Curated annotation (Swiss-Prot):
It comes from the Eukaryota. It comes from Oreamnos americanus (Mountain goat). GO terms for cellular component: mitochondrial inner membrane; respiratory chain complex III. Its main location: mitochondrion. This is Cytochrome b. GO terms for biological process: mitochondrial electron transport, ubiquinol to cytochrome c. Heme 1 (or BL or b562) is low-potential and absorbs at about 562 nm, and heme 2 (or BH or b566) is high-potential and absorbs at about 566 nm. Binds 2 heme b groups non-covalently.
């Protein structure tokens, strides 16, 4: 009799995705981040669900309800900090996952890559709206500044901003709709992740060499299930160390002050995972230009597959491209640092240079490095 997991309509899908899936035998730990992102998403949905049971999306009570969760709800403090720091872990995994894709040429799977970029954008929007919910100073001013950017869109800008706000300023209507969107978007992300996986399984996984691995495949279970469990344990260990020892390490002290429209904080800045994009936004003196640069900082990833000039897929055997890639990583770290600094003399110039370098590396230096390598190998 054939095994039920191979015949049952529902089990068959699970079997083909997680058990009998033919997988390259040489994929490294850089391939663990996909499953880690899945775990992060499940964790965020579960902790978020329990937070939503006690949270109130009203401007007068939102801040107090978060305080109530931390003080009065059983284990509310750990749920709240797991959710807040879970977002940080989510973005660490996202950046590693995208970096892996860039390094090993996984972007040549066009559909998978483009859905991945859409997933990144959706996750960023979800995290932004979540940051508004505690209704602290940085929540309020972050929402005001970031939504106001849309007013730079010619002709319809102002109307668009007021439509998003549900009034003439960030107020009760804004908070309520942000809560509604923040609740629904993770489920949309989960659905998109399924499509992401569907397209990936059409082609099979890439591997560190970038060479077709059809001749050397192994079943996903038990080899990669056990590897994913190890990754998950390390992820949860890191998250719990953060939650239990320094839960506010990555947060902003200003968010422990209730939102006050009459008092602007001295330095408005987003959470650490948006600082690189924020630095790019601020580096352009023109409002519309800044907004376009901000959008392009993520959308530029969609151009990467078309700029692939190398005859090899992966960067594993391409030392010049490797140097360019790690320069990009260093540049992103510099942008992250600049995004958290005030708009003053040395920081402004560094931010502008780092922003120019970011686009230059992706759009010019990477294709040039690939072409040089092709010529060196007489290809």
């Amino acid at each position: 009799m054939t095994n039920i997991r191979k015949t049952h309509p529902l089990m068959k899908i699970v079997n083909n995705a997680f058990i009998d899936l033919p997988t390259p035998s040489n994929i490294s730990s850089w391939w663990n981040f996909g499953s880690l992102l899945g775990i992060c998403l499940i964790l965020q949905i579960l902790t978020g669900l329990f937070l939503a049971m006690h949270y109130t999306s009203d401007t007068t009570t939102a801040f107090s309800s978060v305080t109530h969760i931390c003080r009065d709800v059983n284990y509310g403090w750990i749920i709240r900090y797991m959710h807040a720091n879970g977002a940080s872990m989510f973005f660490i995994c996202l950046f590693m996952h995208v970096g892996r894709g860039l390094y090993y040429g996984s972007y040549t799977f066009l559909e998978t890559w483009n859905i991945g970029v859409i997933l990144l954008l959706t996750t960023m929007x979800t995290a932004f709206m979540g940051y508004v919910l505690p209704w602290g100073q940085m929540s309020f001013w972050g929402a005001t500044v970031x939504t106001n950017l849309l007013s730079a869109i010619p002709y319809i800008g102002t109307d668009l901003v007021e439509w998003i706000w549900g009034g003439f300023s960030v107020d009760k209507a804004t908070l309520t709709r942000f809560f509604a969107f923040h609740f629904i978007l993770p489920f949309i992300i989960a659905a998109l992740a399924m499509v992401h996986l569907l397209f990936l399984h059409e082609t099979g996984s890439n591997n560190p060499t970038g060479i077709l691995s059809d001749a050397d495949k192994i079943p996903f279970h038990p080899y990669y299930t056990i590897k994913d469990i190890l990754g998950a344990m390390l992820l949860i260990l890191t998250l719990m160390l953060l939650v239990l020892f320094s839960p506010d390490l990555l947060g902003d002290p200003d968010n422990y002050t209730p939102a006050n429209p009459l008092n602007t904080p001295p330095h408005i800045k987003p959470e650490w995972y948006f600082l690189f994009a924020y630095a790019i936004l601020r580096s352009i003196p023109n409002k519309l230009g800044g907004v376009l640069a901000l959008a392009l900082s993520i959308l530029v990833l969609m151009f990467v597959p078309f700029l692939h000039m190398s005859k090899q897929r992966s960067m594993m055997f391409r030392p010049i491209s490797q140097c360019v890639f790690w320069t990009l990583v260093a540049d992103l770290l510099a942008l992250t640092w600049i995004g958290g600094q005030p708009v003053e003399h040395p920081y402004m110039v560094i931010g502008q240079l780092a922003s120019i370098m970011y686009f230059l590396i992706i759009l010019v230096m990477m294709p040039v490095a690939s072409t040089i390598e092709n010529n060196l190998l007489k290809w």
